[in-house]
Amino acid sequence: MAVVTMRQLLESGVHFGHQTRRWNPKMKRFIMTERNGIYIIDLQQSLAYIDRSYAFVKETVAKGGTIMFVGTKKQAQEAIAEQATRVGMPYVNQRWLGGMLTNFSTVHQRINRLKELDEIDFDDVAGSSRTKKELLQMRRERDKLNKSLGGIREMTRTPSAVWIVDTNKEHLAVEEARKLRIPIIGILDSNCDPDLVDFPIPGNDDAIRAVGLLTRVVADAVAEGLIARSGVKAGEGAEAVGAEEPLAEWERELLGGEAEQAAVDATGGAATEETPAAESTGAASEAAAVSEAAEPATEQPAADAEA
C-alpha cells in the first residue's frame, strides 16, 4: 500500500511552489512547469522522495532512534505539536533557541529546571515557604520555559534525525543539525536549497494542508518504527518488518493446522472434508505440505480412522 497517493498530494496543494521570481535555481530539477507565475512541483518525484524518507524514518526509529519535529511558522505549529505528541517524539513549534542541539547540555539543565517548577503547587500559598510574589515569579518562569522547551521536556539526548518544515525559516536548526551531522528530513519548496537536506521532499511548505499531510506521513513512519521496535504487528493487512514476514505467515498456518487437528479429534474426521478445497490453491497446498513435514505425527490418527 502506498504511503500517500497522488490524489492526496494534489488535494492538499503540495504541488504549488513560490512565484517564479522567488526561487532557488538548484530546485530546477524538481520543478515540472510554471503556471500563472507560480512554479508547479513535480509530484512524481515527490512521491519517490516521500517513500525514501518514510523508509529512513521507520528504520531509524525501529533501531531505537528519535525524530525531532521542527516547525515554528504559523502554518506548521499545530500539525507539528499534534503529530509529534501522537507518536511521543520531541518537537519545537515556537521559537528555536540557539544551541538547542549544539549546546544541549545547557538546554537539558533548563529542562530539569522546568520539571522542578512543575512540581510546585503555585495555588497553595499558605502551605508554601515562599511568598506570594516569589510564587508568581516562579509561575512566570515556568510558563516561559514551558513555551520554549515544553515540546522537548522528555528528550534526554540529541535526536537521531530532525523533520523540518521550511528550511529557510528554520536555518538555525538546519545549521546546528548539519554541524552535528544529524540527518535532516525536510520539505523543499521552490525557494529552498536542496543541498542542505539529506532526505528532501519537494513540496509546498506554506499551505496548512500540505504541511499537515507531510508531517502526518512522517509521524506514521515513526509509528511503524515504534511498532517494529516492540515487535508488534501493525494490524490486519499491514506488512511485517523485514525478514519476520515469512515467520508470521508460517505461524498462522501452524495455528490453522492445530485448529484443524482439534476439529478432527472432536468430530471424528469431519474436518477432512475441507481438504479438496484447500488443495485447489497452490498456497494452501504448499502450507499443507509444510505442516505435514513439520508435524508428521498428526496425520497418523486420520490414517488409522480411514483404515
UniProtKB/Swiss-Prot annotation:
Residues 259-307 have a biased composition (Low complexity). Residues 256-307 are annotated as: Disordered. It holds the Pfam family Ribosomal_S2. GO terms for cellular component: cytosolic small ribosomal subunit. One of its GO terms (biological process) is translation. PROSITE patterns: RIBOSOMAL_S2_1. CDD domains: RPS2 (cd01425). The keyword Ribonucleoprotein applies. One of its GO terms (molecular function) is structural constituent of ribosome. Keywords: Ribonucleoprotein, Ribosomal protein. Belongs to the universal ribosomal protein uS2 family. PANTHER family: 30S RIBOSOMAL PROTEIN S2 PROKARYOTIC AND ORGANELLAR, SMALL RIBOSOMAL SUBUNIT PROTEIN US2M. NCBIfam families: rpsB_bact. This is Small ribosomal subunit protein uS2.
